Amino acid sequence: MDTAQWPQEIVVKPLEEIVTNTCPKPQPQPLQPQQPPSVGGERKARPEKDQAVNCPRCNSTNTKFCYYNNYSLTQPRYFCKGCRRYWTEGGSLRNIPVGGGSRKNKRSHSSSSDISNNHSDSTQPATKKHLSDHHHHLMSMSQQGLTGQNPKFLETTQQDLNLGFSPHGMIRTNFTDLIHNIGNNTNKSNNNNNPLIVSSCSAMATSSLDLIRNNSNNGNSSNSSFMGFPVHNQDPASGGFSMQDHYKPCNTNTTLLGFSLDHHHNNGFHGGFQGGEEGGEGGDDVNGRHLFPFEDLKLPVSSSSATINVDINEHQKRGSGSDAAATSGGYWTGMLSGGSWC
């Protein structure tokens, strides 16, 4: 179809005109003032400042409306700025205000608390210093009292408190005095120089541990005695109690107490007692002086027991045979050196 044949009545209109004709614009309406909602129709308007109420306490007009008590319009609550009190209209004046007390200046309260804290801090070091001085004074007085009663207390306090035994200075003087008295009682007839004094001086610088070590070392030698004092150690500066100058040891097969440790000589223990007695009667040069007087403890022996002892000794001599010469020199070296027969 040709365009010339189109109807001429059709007129093309712009799109804007079509839109405006189909969608008309709404006309603005005038705004109306909104009315506040009424609560039951009984709520009154808040009193204005022009209607200030006098304070019933100070009759001041410097008051302020706060709120309605119990949400009742008949009990408005006010606050007086002059006397800083609350009251309710239609009620009684309350001396104790509700809600945080009376309004006071918080700065003054904080400043007073700071002053009190500073005062307490300043007085606290003084009291601590006074207590410490008093404590030191009591300690000094107690220490002086103890040292006055016992002069050796100061020496013990300077030592190590962890030691399980007393320091050497506390036992040294008492032990040396005891040894010195024993030497004076046993050697009254001897006018020569007492070697015990020299040995006691050397014992001052030693301890009991050195004595045990020397006994264990000397127990390995052939001339040592069971639990006896060292024999060959003549050095005054060496360890142990050097009393070999005064108390001489017994024979090689007998102890310091006179007991025989040889099964084949001196007839056992009985022979040890007899040998010790003979050595004591013969002189100090052979067997030395015994530490205990066994002659005072000697019991009377009957004839029957004597014959039994002789038979036992003869039986031992027959049984030993040729081994007697080889084992005649055997002795007990002591518990400290291992506890064995040599």
Curated annotation (Swiss-Prot):
Biased composition (Basic residues): 127-136
Alphabetized InterPro entries for the sequence: Dof, Znf_Dof
Annotated segments matching region Disordered: 21-54, 94-136
Organism: Arabidopsis thaliana
The keyword Zinc-finger is assigned to this record: yes
Tissue expression pattern: Accumulates in the stele.
Entry keyword annotation includes Glycosyltransferase: no
Protein name as annotated: Dof zinc finger protein DOF4.6
Pfam families: Zn_ribbon_Dof
An example molecular function term from Gene Ontology annotations: DNA-binding transcription factor activity
